[in-house]
């Protein structure tokens, strides 16, 4: 889309200086012989950041816990890629409810653009980041954000969780050593059934009420839904394709409701649509194509959205149950979607590295 434009290049010896220049708003200006600005435009920095920080794809990002060989002790490490940030801090809380008790300053690696901190935050603690970054047209702002690489969160994505996915407390009985069914020899022979977690069981009276619309609905082998899936597997179905089960924005993870539709209205009439839209902000249903955190399970499908460990454990239980029915499990990943951009409260990536992740008109 820029192919017809003029190409300008910086001298090779400016590469290191460019790392610092990109931490402030940059403009390209055309200046006439009298020193007057004729034209001015902000720069699109994504390509430059890719060129400068390609090595940032190698180190692990997010949270790592456990034995750290360099220090010969157990520790927690937080890592965030924010190459244009002026400062990054982490606000640590001992659990999902307590206010932040510690604020720590992350250190920047100028070659990778990764900010990191290592300390003694225990599994089960929670955190958010404070990212100080220049916003074009605004100036320096401080954004409180969750970790885009979170593996789990508290209710409504308020805080990221310090978890080790290898922790036995997150592993259902039988998880270690568990094997999924063998796949089809050729991909063309896969038979895939697309399924929405909530819709699978929300209205199934054979599922215990507290598990309807939840991950744990799959663990009840004698329900209408699971009997149906086993029958499909016996008939040749090979794979379940789950609509998004990563953390998404549009369903309140606590206190969501099922819309009360207008009595007597035509099913295909405008009254029904208006009734649903009027209650959309609290509706328990959404397809989930508005990701907040790609690597964390959605909390509205868990029996306790407030406890970050529960959603991880229960999603694993659901996967094991589907494998037990003879079905492999895949997940719809929509990396071309985000819930929001800019300074919106449900924008995560764009409030960490403004202008990098999304190309907007």
Predicted regions and their residues:
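Ser/Thr-rich low-complexity repeats and stalk/linker segments
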Residues: 101-109
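Short proline/glycine-enriched turn/loop motifs at strand-loop junctions of beta-rich domains
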Residues: 81-88, 122
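Structural beta-strand segments of beta-rich domains
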Residues: 74-78
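The feature marks proteins involved in alpha-glucan
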Residues: 2-73, 109-117, 121-217
């Amino acid at each position: 889309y820029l192919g017809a434009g003029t190409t300008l290049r910086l001298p090779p010896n400016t590469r290191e200086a460019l790392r610092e220049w990109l931490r402030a708003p940059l403009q390209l200006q055309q200046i006439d012989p009298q020193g007057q600005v004729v034209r001015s435009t902000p720069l699109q920095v994504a390509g430059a950041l890719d060129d400068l920080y390609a090595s940032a794809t190698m180190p692990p990002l997010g949270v790592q816990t456990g034995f750290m060989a360099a220090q010969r002790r157990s520790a927690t490490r937080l890592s965030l890629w924010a190459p244009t940030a002026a400062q990054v801090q982490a606000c640590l809380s001992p659990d999902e409810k307590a206010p932040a008790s510690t604020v720590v300053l992350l250190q920047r690696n100028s070659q990778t653009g990764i900010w990191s901190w290592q300390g003694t935050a225990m599994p089960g603690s929670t955190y958010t980041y404070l990212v100080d970054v220049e916003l074009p047209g605004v100036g320096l702002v401080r954004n409180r954000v969750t970790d885009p690489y979170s593996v789990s969160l508290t209710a409504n994505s308020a805080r990221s969780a310090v978890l080790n996915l290898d922790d036995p407390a997150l592993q259902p009985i039988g998880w270690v050593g568990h094997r999924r069914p063998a796949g089809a020899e050729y991909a063309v022979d896969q038979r895939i059934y697309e399924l929405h977690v909530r819709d699978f069981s929300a209205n199934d009276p054979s599922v215990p009420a507290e598990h309807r619309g939840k991950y744990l609905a799959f663990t009840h082998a004698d329900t209408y839904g699971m009997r149906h899936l086993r029958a499909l597997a016996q008939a040749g179905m090979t794979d379940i394709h789950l609509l998004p089960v990563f953390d998404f924005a549009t369903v309140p993870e606590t206190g969501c409701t099922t819309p009360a539709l207008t009595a007597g209205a035509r099913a295909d009439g405008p009254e029904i649509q208006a009734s649903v839209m009027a209650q959309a902000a609290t509706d328990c249903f959404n397809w989930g194509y508005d990701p907040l955190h790609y690597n964390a399970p959605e909390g509205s499908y868990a029996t306790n959205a407030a406890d970050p460990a529960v959603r991880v454990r229960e999603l694993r239980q659901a996967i094991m149950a589907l494998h037990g029915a003879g079905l492999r499990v895949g997940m719809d990943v929509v990396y071309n979607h985000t819930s929001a951009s800019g300074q919106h409260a449900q924008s995560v990536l764009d409030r960490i590295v403004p202008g990098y992740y999304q190309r907007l008109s």
